[in-house]
Amino acid sequence: MVSEAPPFWWRKPDWRAWGLSPFSFLYGRVAGHRMVHGRRASVPVPVICVGNFTVGGAGKTPTALALARAAKTKGLKPGFLSRGYGGSLDVTTVVDPHDHHATAVGDEPLLLAREALTVIARRRADGAERLVREGADLIIMDDGFQSAQLAIDYALVVIDATRGIGNGHLVPGGPVRAPLRTQLGYTSGLLKVGDGNAADRIVRLAARAGKPFFSASIKTLGQEDLQGRKVLAFAGIADPTKFFRTVETLGAGIAVRRSFGDHEHLEEDEIADILDVADRDGLEIVTTSKDYVRLIGHHGRADELLARCRVIEIAMVFDDPHAPELIIDRAIAAARERRLREGWTGKTLLPSGEK
């Protein structure tokens, strides 16, 4: 999978997108075939997948966290399943946020593990089985929508209202991961995040396909005292400009911006540059939670940078506060039907309100 999205993916199709069309066609054939014909392992608990149609960030991790919090209020024990992208471990592992570092397990699993039981696995079926053994009664997959490795009971596809699906072309000519018709066929619900009209076309397509639609926004937690402060902001996420806009909405003036690749671990000279520029210009340093956890256990002056960083924590807030519970209930109901079809025996979870 492409890890860095070139800027032309997010603009109107140009000669590069059209020139790469033959390769996009081949990529789409393979990705679509995998989604349709992949052998999906089945586990005896409900599985919710939080995915997106495109390469890059759309808010999957904060969405997964919001669902886990809702699950816990219902008395469930959710468990996160992640591939551990950016980490070096290639064995199925229960993530310990106190002992593991991002270099081993990836940055997103560390954030997830602060909230609930988290397992990383190269084979998602292995990870799901481990979560069940560890006592999870609801699995929330952070990404993996196109992988076709695990039977999914509810696929919530997250789409950024300001970016949509970019130029609409498949990889490598655009950011789309598999043919949209195929992806929509496996979509249970769509979540539009933020304001903007870039996602309107795909929302209409989903509506015509009878898919339920939810909306949400990303809210910052605290940091109101940044109003009027001059800061150096750095981010190594899929869309750093989104983070910079968030900092500006808090009233801070960004004097210096530093953008890095998604999941990128900073080199010693990059850490030193951030600290030296902030010292020279008298700036506070702000960053994302993902960038912060990647610095833990780092070398050189990383501890100094950790001590000086102000982390902008965010949360996904659904417009309808009951939406997460509704999604969980639908996943539970779908899992019950799947278990009956497949002949599972034992305790069956029921949506809230049923006995």
Swiss-Prot record:
PANTHER family in the record: TETRAACYLDISACCHARIDE 4'-KINASE, TETRAACYLDISACCHARIDE 4'-KINASE, MITOCHONDRIAL-RELATED
Originating species: Rhizobium rhizogenes (strain K84 / ATCC BAA-868)
Gene Ontology MF: a single term: ATP binding
Binding site for ATP: 54-61
Similarity comment: Belongs to the LpxK family.
One Gene Ontology term from the biological process aspect of the record: lipopolysaccharide core region biosynthetic process
Catalytic activity: a lipid A disaccharide + ATP = a lipid IVA + ADP + H(+)
Protein name (Swiss-Prot/TrEMBL): Tetraacyldisaccharide 4'-kinase
HAMAP family registered for this protein in UniProt: LpxK (MF_00409)
UniProt pathway: Glycolipid biosynthesis; lipid IV(A) biosynthesis; lipid IV(A) from (3R)-3-hydroxytetradecanoyl-[acyl-carrier-protein] and UDP-N-acetyl-alpha-D-glucosamine: step 6/6
CC per GO annotation: plasma membrane
Keywords: ATP-binding, Kinase, Lipid A biosynthesis, Lipid biosynthesis, Lipid metabolism, Nucleotide-binding, Transferase
Function per UniProt: Transfers the gamma-phosphate of ATP to the 4'-position of a tetraacyldisaccharide 1-phosphate intermediate (termed DS-1-P) to form tetraacyldisaccharide 1,4'-bis-phosphate (lipid IVA).
Record Pfam families: LpxK
Enzymatic class: transferase
InterPro entries, A to Z: LpxK, P-loop_NTPase
EC number(s) per entry: 2.7.1.130
